[in-house]
């Protein structure tokens, strides 16, 4: 099944910002997301993430680490929430219950502790995008060359 944005655009037009100070982690997440035709933007710290977030007006979702130099993930989340309701997934080694609860208090949509399954991460990304109405996946199905538009 192929996910599309409302209006029929492919998901490859959806931008996901991946923020982690470890380049290997960003590459791993990016590889799995690009296989699903997402466009991935990367930031190595919180300040860079905020620069990209304000420059790119159409970011569909943010995947955010907590422990980073310059500006941590908590502060990035606070700043983003001042101006936007863009979905945020925390992807972090901080698996303590207090950290997870703090994330939800700050407005994250999902909290995933490392180590994690990249396939589950992608499934959660797709589920959040469907729930937030950024895709019309429930309206348009495509399988074996057959396209069904439920809204038609």
Language-model regions, residue ranges each:
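Charged docking surfaces used in two-component/phosphorelay signaling
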Residues: 27-35
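Acidic catalytic/metal-coordinating carboxylates
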Residues: 45-48, 72-75, 99
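Short, Lys/Arg-enriched segments at the junction into DNA-binding effector domains
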Residues: 14-15, 127-152
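Receiver (REC) domain active-site loop signature in two-component systems and cognate sites
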Residues: 68
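Acidic, metal-coordinating helix/loop segments flanking the phosphotransfer/catalytic sites
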Residues: 42-61
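Active-site residues of response regulator receiver
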Residues: 20, 65, 92
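Short amphipathic alpha-helix used as the core "switch/output" element in two-component signaling
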Residues: 51, 74-85
């Amino acid at each position: 099944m192929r996910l599309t944005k409302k209006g029929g655009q492919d998901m490859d037009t959806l931008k996901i910002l991946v923020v982690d100070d470890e380049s290997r982690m960003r590459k791993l997440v990016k590889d799995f997301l690009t296989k699903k035709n997402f466009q991935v933007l990367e930031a190595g710290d919180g300040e860079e993430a905020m620069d990209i977030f304000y420059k790119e007006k159409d970011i569909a979702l943010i995947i955010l680490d907590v422990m980073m130099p310059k500006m941590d993930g908590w502060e990035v989340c606070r700043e983003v929430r001042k101006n936007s309701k863009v979905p945020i997934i925390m992807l972090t080694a901080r698996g303590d219950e207090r950290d997870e609860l703090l994330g939800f208090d700050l407005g994250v949509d999902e909290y995933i502790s490392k180590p994690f399954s990249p396939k589950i991460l992608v499934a959660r990304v797709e589920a959040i995008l469907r729930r937030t109405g950024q895709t019309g996946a429930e309206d348009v199905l495509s399988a074996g060359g057959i396209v069904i538009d439920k809204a038609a």
